[in-house]
């Protein structure tokens, strides 16, 4: 890359050379759900059914990452059938729901995939995510993350959770690895 403190212009704005260097080595992207893949709102129906909105652009970014040899996993504190369904649609096979201590699932993923922590990126939005974020090679907070999480992250997205933040991270990883052009024309 370039000198420390330098940055690279991207379609999302300038990104530090340090972040790009970290992104270049990522082989596993771990995502939270509420506040990252969704906007954090939960809609409750009269019969107790739970609904969330997922951004199609995030889905496209995930598919591009998966087809570019970047594994994608979900670790979430809540449990919902609709998250299972969304993961199945996108081809995400590593799903950990109902995780009050996300470090347990993180350790399981590292062992199962034989990946070192420095080759992992984690995208979170709240304090439950911080224990994992401080262990990974690239920690990312979404733009509307908890105020205490933002200064601790290596990278803060320009886009809010549930609005394309995951796509921004996927594009960043693919750009750093020289694979972004391969994503053109793919279908989800």
Swiss-Prot record:
Mind telling me which CDD domains this protein's record contains? Answer: HAD_KDO-like (cd01630)
Magnesium as UniProt keyword? yes
GO terms (BP aspect): lipopolysaccharide biosynthetic process
Pathway listed for it is:
Carbohydrate biosynthesis; 3-deoxy-D-manno-octulosonate biosynthesis; 3-deoxy-D-manno-octulosonate from D-ribulose 5-phosphate: step 3/3; Bacterial outer membrane biogenesis; lipopolysaccharide biosynthesis
The alphabetized UniProt keywords are:
Hydrolase, Lipopolysaccharide biosynthesis, Magnesium, Metal-binding
What EC number(s) does its UniProt record assign? 3.1.3.45
Enzyme class per UniProt: hydrolase
- Entry's Pfam families? Hydrolase_3
Q: Which SUPFAM superfamilies match?
A: HAD-like
Which cofactors are named for this entry?
Answer: Mg(2+)
Q: Which PANTHER family match?
A: HAD SUPERFAMILY MEMBERS CMAS AND KDSC, N-ACYLNEURAMINATE CYTIDYLYLTRANSFERASE-RELATED
What does it do?
Answer: Catalyzes the hydrolysis of 3-deoxy-D-manno-octulosonate 8-phosphate (KDO 8-P) to 3-deoxy-D-manno-octulosonate (KDO) and inorganic phosphate.
Q: What is this protein called?
A: 3-deoxy-D-manno-octulosonate 8-phosphate phosphatase KdsC
